[in-house]
Amino acid sequence: MLNEFIAIRRELHQIPETGYKELKTQAYLLDYISKLPSGHLEVKKWRTGILVLVKGTNPEKTIGYRTDIDALPITEETELPFASKHPGNMHACGHDLHMSIALGVLTHFASKPAKDNLLFVFQPAEEGPGGAKPIMESTEFAEWRPDSIYGLHIAPEYKVGEIAIKPGLLFANTSELFISFKGKGGHAAYPHLANDMVVAASAFVGQMQTIISRNIDPMDSAVITIGRIHGGEIQNVIAETAYLDGTIRTLSPETMEIVWTRLKQLAKGWEEAYQCEVEFHPGSDYYQVDNDPVETEEFIHFLEEQYPESYVPARSAMTGEDFGYFLSEIKGFMFWLGVDSEYSLHHAKLNPKEEAIPFAIDVLIHFLESK
């Protein structure tokens, strides 16, 4: 018989929605939650997200658990029988698994409340524009603000049954990067009468990499990736505009500041050298996921005692996750959950092993009961 929460994952997988558009997802979650024993539950909506408080039997504190609920604008290529029914959208980062795990844990505690309050945060817009910071600033969250908070993220590179975690920095600081170049278009036969923005933008892509190699301490780490370039409209017209979209990832906020300062300095030079306008457009910023050392060591000890084959020491990764905003103010941690997939996160063929769902539910129930 198919595990109930694997079945839920498959249903959620078919209705992927991007940030702040998770209307069907929110409705699905609310419908499921409405069928749980309600004696200890309080539910609030926040935009397209949900907060659920499970009142404890003798509460002295509130423990938070956060899951993200949004999907990515990716066309799915898995050919699964439960593939996305929303063309151009896919749960390619595992948030469908994250939600089903959270529902599994919530279901248990709705029937068997813990001593302390438990707050379940179903957060929208993790992939962009970033939902963690605004939900934290909401009055809904403030009323139930937890004393500690936890979360997980699936990891294709780890096996099912493995949990990877480390104290301190787990995920990097991440900034989205959107740059526009505006010059003067013209006929391809007369380049001397135009300012070619394809040339300007292309040269900028190469030059910005010197920030990493020449302005960042070699013992530190940072990466600038340009994932999309667009310039011009037709083959025989010199492009008047060009656009670069990408990300910056660093291991500290200070290094992020260095990268941004140098990018803006380079842009001023580009305006002079290429007789153009260079403009930076706002995107999402993701604060580093910095695991609380005491909380993390407590969880590692729990794993070693209860799941001795599961614990794997993690390494810091350049991945971005807005859960870092929670951890910047509230003690807690995030861990990697092994799902053993051939394809990486954000890949159109990502197909996590679903056995990780009941395993994660079991681990989280026992851990939260131990708190």
Swiss-Prot record:
SUPFAM superfamilies the record matches: Bacterial exopeptidase dimerisation domain, Zn-dependent exopeptidases
Pfam families for the chain: M20_dimer (PF07687), Peptidase_M20 (PF01546)
Stored InterPro entries: AcetylDAP_deacetylase, Amidohydrolase, Bact_exopeptidase_dim_dom, Peptidase_M20, Peptidase_M20_dimer
| Alphabetical GO biological process terms | diaminopimelate biosynthetic process; lysine biosynthetic process via diaminopimelate
Record: active site: 68, 127 (proton acceptor)
Q: Known catalysed reaction(s)?
A: N-acetyl-(2S,6S)-2,6-diaminopimelate + H2O = (2S,6S)-2,6-diaminopimelate + acetate
Q: What is its EC number?
A: 3.5.1.47
**Origin: domain of life:** Bacteria
The kind of enzyme this is, by top-level EC class, is: hydrolase
What pathway is it annotated to?
Amino-acid biosynthesis; L-lysine biosynthesis via DAP pathway; LL-2,6-diaminopimelate from (S)-tetrahydrodipicolinate (acetylase route): step 3/3
Q: GO terms for molecular function, please?
A: N-acetyldiaminopimelate deacetylase activity
Keywords, ordered alphabetically? Amino-acid biosynthesis, Diaminopimelate biosynthesis, Hydrolase, Lysine biosynthesis
Q: Which family does it belong to?
A: Belongs to the peptidase M20A family. N-acetyldiaminopimelate deacetylase subfamily.
Q: What does this protein do?
A: Catalyzes the conversion of N-acetyl-diaminopimelate to diaminopimelate and acetate.
Instruction: List the protein's name.
Output: N-acetyldiaminopimelate deacetylase
Q: Which organism is it from?
A: Listeria monocytogenes serovar 1/2a (strain ATCC BAA-679 / EGD-e)
